[in-house]
């Protein structure tokens, strides 16, 4: 509702999803038809469950492995854990929750970049940070290296930003020249297992500190300070 700046979901849909999750957890098995229905319900409810997208993609990925007309298949352990995560969130879900968007919420802006063979950098107003890759981090993919400083920043400064906002939910706008991560973070989804783990950690931090992390793509030539920091040239 744009007039009240709130998101409202039907309690009927929430209760139906909880019943479906409970049924799956009791039986430990699912058919494609049942699981497809649940995926659709959770996609609808995700708009009201803050920072929940990273816990949704595995369901759609698993759905693609199910076939029509086949016997119900046993649910893998990681999916059972995700079902319990959704069950817990839906049990405490308010029918109406406030919007979090840059137009009406507190905002902080940072700029980040990563150098594949050196390190990464973050520019936050008058504060600048840089990190030299460890031997193991050097083996990571480019999207992983671009995503890591964002998660590290929220882990380190999330509580400070939350206090600055007086406990209100707000938006952390991250300006990055990574198109891949602009999509991944905003969608809460990545096909890379390493990046998916970082997105889950980021989602957990967003819920803890009341931050909605929104990536805004920035051309490389407009991201000079973060680029120089990532190369330890500044």
Task: Describe the predicted segments one by one.
Residues 1-6, 42, 48, 209-234:
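C-terminal functional segments of enzyme domains
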Residues 95-105, 164-166:
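A short acidic-Thr-Gly-centered motif at the start of a beta-strand
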Residues 105-117:
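Two-metal-ion RNase H-like nuclease active-site motif
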Residues 22-23, 124-148, 156, 180-189, ...:
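A short, polar/acidic, helix/strand-boundary loop motif
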Residues 17, 39-40, 59, 113, ...:
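Mobile genetic element proteins and their domesticated derivatives, centered on retroelements
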Residues 1-99:
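C-terminal reverse transcriptase regions that engage the nucleic-acid substrate
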Residues 53, 187-195, 229-234:
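Short secondary-structure boundary/capping segments
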Residues 154-224:
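RNase H catalytic domain
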């Amino acid at each position: 509702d744009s007039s009240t700046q709130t998101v409202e979901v039907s309690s009927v849909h929430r209760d139906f999803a909880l019943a479906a999750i409970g049924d799956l957890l009791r039986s430990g098995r699912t058919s494609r038809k049942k699981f497809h229905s649940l995926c659709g319900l959770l996609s609808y409810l995700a708009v009201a469950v803050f920072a929940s997208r990273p816990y949704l993609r595995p369901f759609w990925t698993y759905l693609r492995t199910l076939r029509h007309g086949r016997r119900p298949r046993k649910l893998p352990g990681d999916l059972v854990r995700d079902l319990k995560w959704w069950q817990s969130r839906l049990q405490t879900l308010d029918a109406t929750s406030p919007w979090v968007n840059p137009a009406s919420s507190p905002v902080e802006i940072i700029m980040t970049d990563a150098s594949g063979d050196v390190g990464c950098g973050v520019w936050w107003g008058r504060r600048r940070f840089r990190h030299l890759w460890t031997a193991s981090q050097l083996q990571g993919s480019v999207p992983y290296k671009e995503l890591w400083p964002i998660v590290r920043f929220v882990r380190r400064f999330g509580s400070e930003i939350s206090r600055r906002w007086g406990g209100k939910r707000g938006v952390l706008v991250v300006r990055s020249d990574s198109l891949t991560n602009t999509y991944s973070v905003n969608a809460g989804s990545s096909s890379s297992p390493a990046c998916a783990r970082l997105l889950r950690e980021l989602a957990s931090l967003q819920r803890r500190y009341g931050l909605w992390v929104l990536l805004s793509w920035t051309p490389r030539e407009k991201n000079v300070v973060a680029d120089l920091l990532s190369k330890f040239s500044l």
